[in-house]
Amino acid sequence: ESFERPVTAMGEVNSPLLPSKRKWKQHGQGGLWISDWLPNHARIADELCVLRSCVSDGINHAGGVCQMNTGSVFGGRPSLGAWATYGLGTENQSLPGFVVLKDSKSAIVNGVRCWGSGFMPAGYQGVLLEPGDEPIANLNRPRGVSRAQHERKLTLLNKLNRQHARGRESNTELEARIRSYELAYRMQAEAPEAVDLSAETESTRRLYGLDNETTQVYGRQCLMARRLVERGVRFVQLYHGAGSKWDSHSGMEKNHSRLCAQVDIPIVGLLTDLKQRGLLEDTLVIWGGEFGRTPMSEKGDGRDHNPTGFTMYLAGGGVKGGQTIGATDDLGLYAVQDKLHVHDIHATILALMGLDHTQ
């Protein structure tokens, strides 16, 4: 109910259908329908390519999240970010090529499998940055240890690691661990500045909603994502609602109203900022989840999982904005026009990055 108006049956005799509680308006040159759950998105309507007919095979969170990230409902395959990093490399040798940000200490469904490298070398998996003032724990040099002392310790550690690795060339996890130590050393010079938001102007902080208690957590994520992209990180993945907070089997009106308010301003701020800085043309932004919610009620005021017809959107990265693709049936339950399976979505994303999904 964010980008597609459901059918109403007001006035019909004995109709079980109720009208949506959302209010709808068309915005932008393309006349994109946006509900009052995301009022600030009206400002970026012409940047959005809304996919209304997404379909997945995952009926529960574990399978759905796994497929949306890896293309398979079963674990063991590389994540989309790992493929992007494998195919395109990184533009900054002092920062990870693939970074994951989350909004709370709560666990993400499937955990590291969402950003893992599967059967590829472990070095391509994402690096998780924790929420709060210290996204990367223990990155800075310990107090009382000089730079020269620190370098000598790391040199010895690298020598021991390389000796241990001889004869174990097939152990990609060991190689990834060695590379992670080397990357951590390089990150000590650049990462603290990359994740330090204090240098941002007040106007930029307001743009992302950092001045508002409701939006400041996700606003920090979005602003940090822009700073990482600006510094050459290839793939940045943001999680909002860690701990399945969007899973509104009950209390959907209250829950989704609160969650939409948390993300609306920060997302708009991110797209606006990327465009102002000339980064949006080369940065693909993808927004969505593992599935949608059914039009039928559950437990009176909730909705169940719906993998048969849901909405996502793309922006930037060469995407033509101000348009919608596909449609569900009148109830919003099944995709009926231009169905886009998760595999189609992944193929499109990889193509926009210049990668052939068949290779």
What are these language model-derived features?
Residues E1-Q359:
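Ligand-binding pockets and gating/stacking loops
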